[in-house]
From Swiss-Prot:
One of its GO terms (cellular component) is membrane. InterPro entries: P53_induced (IPR015664), PMP22/EMP/MP20/Claudin (IPR004031). It is found in: Membrane; Cell junction, Adherens junction. Keywords: Cell junction, Membrane, Transmembrane, Transmembrane helix. Regulates cell junction organization in epithelial cells. It is a multi-pass membrane protein. The lineage of its organism: Eukaryota, Metazoa, Chordata, Craniata, Vertebrata. Belongs to the TMEM47 family. The chain crosses the membrane at residues 21-41, 81-101, 115-135, 152-172. This is Transmembrane protein 47. It comes from the Eukaryota. GO terms for biological process: cell-cell adhesion. Gene3D superfamilies: 1.20.140.150.
Amino acid sequence: MASSVSGAEEVRVSALTPLKLVGLVCVFLALCLDVGAVLSPAWVTADDQYHLSLWKSCSKPAASATWRCNSTLGTDWQIATLALLLGGAFLILLSFLVALVSVCIRSRRRFYRPVAIMLFAAVVLQACCLVLYPIKFIETISLRIYHEFNWGYGLAWGATIFSFGGAILYCLNPKNYEDYY
């Protein structure tokens, strides 16, 4: 029986490796965590008297039962924090879409490097955001009560860590191990 594909027409099809699939899952998780961090109402909380998010700051005097909220987009460091986090989230979204497209088409290898570069850039942006935020918070806002960085801040760190993991997985040289799968 003759082969339907001649030697000149043979196309190299790269297999989807488990590491790239895990990388795609890492990027998806990073994207979900970033959405949660951006929408979180609690980046800093203080004894049920104060909470700060990326969008608003709310305080409640000890004798009062009502919360007084203000926009946080009035100070430059909070705008910079939000811009860095949203920039990183945009890069993660873009890298997720490129990685998803690479799963659907036959030639995957050419997409590995751009995805890894975008993820490393997102990690740098988000790490800058996550270092800037507590430094400027402690420098500018003086709370005389116990306060802690809450789950919104933790979600942003989780997104950064998953982005870094996905970037590492997309950096692995596929030529060394793709033939084994």
